[in-house]
Regions:
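General structural signal for secondary-structure boundaries
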Residues: 1, 105, 127, 167-173
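Glycine-rich anion/phosphate-binding loops
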Residues: 1-9
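Active-site phosphate/pyrophosphate-binding segments
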Residues: 132-173
Length: 173
């Protein structure tokens, strides 16, 4: 939560758009960035994210399972893009079963074809690459007029982010 809180604060301060990839099952009891948490909902993350409404463009992309807090962030984005292989629900299998509502596999909860019909998903992509292309195109609509355009050397980025998207990396480098 602390990283996303910081991102939201910077986006608000500098009026920057945010593209968030929401795959995941939400918080876990063993999370260490919030030590006084019972349910994890008294953190500023969700209020900060919601507070960006009308200030910063928020685009959410999902590929795979997206439950709990991740689904809340996805649902509150201005534009929601999901792949055909997405399952999005406010509760995952453990919460549903723990609530006494039965046992379900993750693929039985919020499949993309249902969420598209319900209006949860704005754009359905065939895969994450196409979803990212959709986000890039949407961002281009909000950049305004460009008289002169420059970009820093992007080659250094290939060594900053790990090739496996599930690996951690030093965020302050």
């Amino acid at each position: 939560h602390m990283k996303l809180d910081r991102i939201c604060e910077k986006a608000k301060k500098y009026k920057l758009p945010i593209v968030i990839f929401t795959e995941g099952g939400g918080g876990r009891p063993g999370d260490t960035d919030i030590t006084t948490s019972i349910a994890g909902l008294h953190v500023p993350t969700f209020a900060l994210w919601g507070g960006l409404t009308g200030r910063c463009l928020r685009i959410a992309i999902n590929n795979g399972f997206c439950f709990a807090g991740n689904a809340a962030l996805f649902g509150c984005a201005d534009i929601r893009i999901a792949t055909k292989n997405s399952w999005i629900g406010m509760a995952g299998p453990a919460m549903i079963e723990g609530g006494g509502l039965g046992s379900y596999s993750p693929k039985e909860i919020g499949p993309s074809e249902v969420n598209e019909k319900n209006g949860v998903i704005d754009l359905v992509a065939k895969d994450e690459a196409e979803a990212t292309d959709f986000a890039k195109k949407i961002l281009s609509y909000f950049q305004g007029d460009l008289v002169d355009w420059k970009i820093e050397d992007q080659a250094q980025l290939k060594d900053i982010m790990p090739k496996n998207r599930k690996w951690s990396y030093p965020i302050r480098n």
